[in-house]
From Swiss-Prot:
Protein name per its UniProtKB record: Histone H1, early embryonic
Keyword rRNA-binding tagged: no
Nucleus found in the keyword field: yes
Ranges where the H15 domain occurs: 17-91
SUPFAM superfamilies: Winged helix' DNA-binding domain (SSF46785)
Keywords: Chromosome, DNA-binding, Nucleus
Span list, region Disordered: 1-21, 94-205
Annotated InterPro entries: H1/H5 (IPR005819), Histone_H1/H5_H15 (IPR005818), WH-like_DNA-bd_sf (IPR036388), WH_DNA-bd_sf (IPR036390)
Originating organism: Strongylocentrotus purpuratus
Biased composition (Basic residues): 135-150, 157-205
Localization (cell): Nucleus; Chromosome
Length: 205
């Protein structure tokens, strides 16, 4: 029993091989283009040839569509009464329907455009927020500023090393001070030859 019920559900879900009866009737009348109106027989023939329909089952729906179309003003009955006469499409009603459909399509297009714009704005705002949050992470990157500190330390070390070099020439300057002392000791040696000169003067007297 469960299998039979499942098979029935599947058959109901299948899409119809033809549009609704009202649409088929409207297309048949517009395509036949009869000035005096299209009869029920002409409408049935057109539907049977152009649509995959079992006329025995659809005949009742076609008659209902004709009656409802006349009541709603979509169709005009030129001859007969009920569904046995001739029918034409109400041009004014058709124009009104076309304008209504156009308006609905425009409204749908506007709604779609607004939704797309809203989505784009949402994406752009998300991108801006993401970009705004990124600089916060960049603030934590003053690690590069630590590198110049190393350079200053290196410069300080370089400055300290030349201070040690001038100490060596200071020792060299102390050595030339000892040399003039030796020259002073040599001067009394030159004064000794002056004494014999005085002796020579006495002898000459």
């Amino acid at each position: 029993m469960a299998e039979k019920n499942s098979s029935k559900k599947v058959t109901t879900k299948k899409p119809a091989a033809h549009p609704p009866a009202a649409e088929m009737v409207a297309t048949a009348i517009t395509e036949l283009k009869d000035r005096n109106g299209s009869s029920l027989q002409a409408i049935k023939k057109y539907i049977a040839t152009n649509f995959d329909v079992q006329m025995d089952r659809q005949l009742l729906f076609i008659k209902r569509a004709l009656k409802s179309g006349v009541e709603k003003g979509k169709l005009v009955q030129t001859k007969g009464k009920g569904a046995s006469g001739s029918f034409k499409v109400n041009v004014q009603a058709a124009k009104a329907q076309a304008s209504e459909k156009a308006k609905k399509e425009k409204e749908k297009a506007k709604l779609l455009a607004q939704r797309e714009k809203a989505k784009e704005k949402g994406c752009s705002e998300e991108g801006e927020t993401a970009e705004g949050s990124r600089p916060k992470k960049v603030k934590a990157a003053p690690k590069k500023a630590k590198k110049p500190v190393k350079k200053t330390t290196e410069k300080k070390e370089k400055k300290k090393t030349p201070k040690k070099a001038p100490k060596k020439p200071a020792a060299k300057k102390s050595t030339p001070k000892k040399t003039p002392k030796k020259a002073a000791a040599k001067k009394p040696k030159t004064a000794k030859p002056k004494k014999p000169a005085x002796k020579k003067a006495a002898k000459s007297k």
